[in-house]
């Protein structure tokens, strides 16, 4: 059976790949699989981002769920972490988010959460796929047993309350918020304003025709320009910026000079603060194989270890849970803090980071100054075969680079999960050296692929 789920739920072009028929089937199968052994009276929470196709797919998913006899609570436009949090807070049977995150406007997606607010395991996803493929045994309610769809937009306030709880007084800050015309268009600016910040919101409308278009965490240029403009106009103000993606499960930042503060920088600041108050479980942060070696070095000076997972917040979360840890993330801005939520939470991350800036009465630039980002070279080699990395010549080329770099750098050569590419990444302090080494390895891969 072909896989329906990808690395983060089901995604595709709305009404082409991800049709209402498939959405209905997923709603029906998901409800049956995830609630088979639970309380039959517990509803399923459903949320969405601002995409134009969101209401169409929401209606189909809700219909599929209702056909099994399960009620739904539609919370409207809310960030993905909001659906996860609300699902757990109201003790729902499950949660569903309709979003394609940072993908283009024509795409959409469906992801499920268990009653605890965590994303599904591979086994649960396969069970749903099997039920979509063979729905004969699924329940089909009739008469008074058909599920009822209820609007419950007010439940988004439960998520909002968790955002501002424990946040610092931000009245010393001017925060430019780029909401990407997405799910955080309301809750993001509102949270910072509630905590006292002067808020300048851009791309903060419910506009699914422009979600992620030249804005948000995938394009920081407008945000950086606005931060610099306000900083020049208000020299006595402390201006900084935060950008979310379409479903606000990630956040990136811009400091007072317009420089980008990525997820590695954020992890350093938050992990350091957690360790100081004794709240960093295992004194370990889970990053990914793409986390810069500069982060590893900076954490080490704080007595913090860096464990590495595969690329993707799904794999960061798996490593956290497997190792009994609570904090990790990615360069892309997915930060998972199991003290606060069960998934990446852009607004939650932003409140936590800006609270540290305000409490320590410092600048974002100063907070991340301990992280010296090592130069990184990333080359992509197009290949037709998937066994290229198994060849002796490629393995020896990688080993040779590892010996030459020693503790002063690292190499990662991996197959792309989405394209016919081999990615060659080398980090080190000498840019000319790592450029030479990366090109040598890439050429070896090219020859081996012929």
What residue ranges belong to the model's regions?
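Proline/glycine-rich low-complexity loops and linkers
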Residues: 81-82, 126-161, 165, 256-329, ...
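Phosphate-binding and adjacent anionic-ligand microenvironments
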Residues: 240, 277-450
């Amino acid at each position: 059976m072909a896989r329906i789920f990808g690395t983060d739920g089901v995604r595709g072009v709305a009404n082409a790949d991800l049709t209402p028929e498939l959405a209905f089937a997923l709603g029906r199968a998901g409800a049956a699989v995830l609630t088979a052994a639970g309380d039959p009276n517990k509803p399923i929470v459903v949320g969405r981002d601002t995409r134009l196709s969101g209401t169409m797919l929401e209606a189909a998913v809700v219909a599929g769920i209702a056909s099994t006899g399960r009620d739904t609570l539609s919370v409207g436009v809310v960030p993905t972490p909001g659906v996860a949090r609300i699902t757990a807070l109201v003790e729902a049977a499950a949660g569903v988010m309709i979003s394609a995150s940072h993908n283009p406007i024509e795409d959409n997606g469906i992801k499920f959460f268990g009653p605890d607010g965590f994303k599904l395991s591979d086994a649960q996803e396969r069970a749903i796929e099997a039920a979509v493929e063979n729905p004969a045994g699924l329940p089909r309610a009739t008469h008074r047993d058909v599920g009822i769809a209820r609007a419950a937009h007010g439940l988004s306030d439960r998520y909002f309350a968790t955002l501002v709880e424990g946040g610092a007084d931000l009245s010393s800050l001017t925060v430019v918020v780029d909401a990407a015309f997405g799910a955080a268009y309301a809750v993001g600016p509102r949270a910072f304003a509630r905590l006292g910040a002067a808020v300048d919101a851009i791309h903060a409308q419910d506009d699914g025709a422009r979600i992620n278009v030249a804005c948000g965490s995938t394009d920081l240029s407008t945000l950086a320009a606005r931060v610099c403009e306000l900083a020049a106009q208000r020299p006595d103000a402390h201006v900084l910026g935060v950008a979310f993606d379409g479903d606000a499960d990630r956040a990136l930042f811009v400091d007072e000079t317009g420089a980008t503060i990525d997820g590695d920088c954020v992890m350093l600041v938050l992990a350091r603060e957690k360790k100081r108050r004794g709240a960093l479980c295992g004194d370990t942060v889970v990053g990914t194989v793409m986390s810069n070696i500069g982060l590893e070095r900076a954490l080490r000076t704080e007595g913090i270890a860096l464990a590495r997972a595969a690329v993707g917040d799904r794999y960061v979360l798996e490593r956290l849970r497997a190792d009994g840890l609570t904090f990790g993330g990615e360069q892309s801005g997915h930060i998972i803090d199991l003290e606060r939520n069960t998934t990446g939470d852009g607004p939650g991350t932003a409140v936590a980071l800006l609270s540290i800036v305000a409490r320590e009465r410092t600048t974002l630039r100063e907070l991340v100054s301990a992280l010296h980002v090592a130069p990184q070279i990333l080359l992509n080699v197009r290949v037709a075969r998937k066994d290229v990395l198994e060849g002796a010549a490629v393995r020896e080329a990688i080993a040779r680079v590892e010996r030459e770099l020693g503790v002063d750098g690292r190499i990662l050569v991996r197959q792309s999960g989405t394209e016919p590419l081999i990615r060659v990444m080398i980090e080190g302090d000498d840019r000319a050296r790592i450029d030479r080494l990366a090109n040598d390895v890439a050429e070896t891969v090219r020859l081996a692929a012929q």
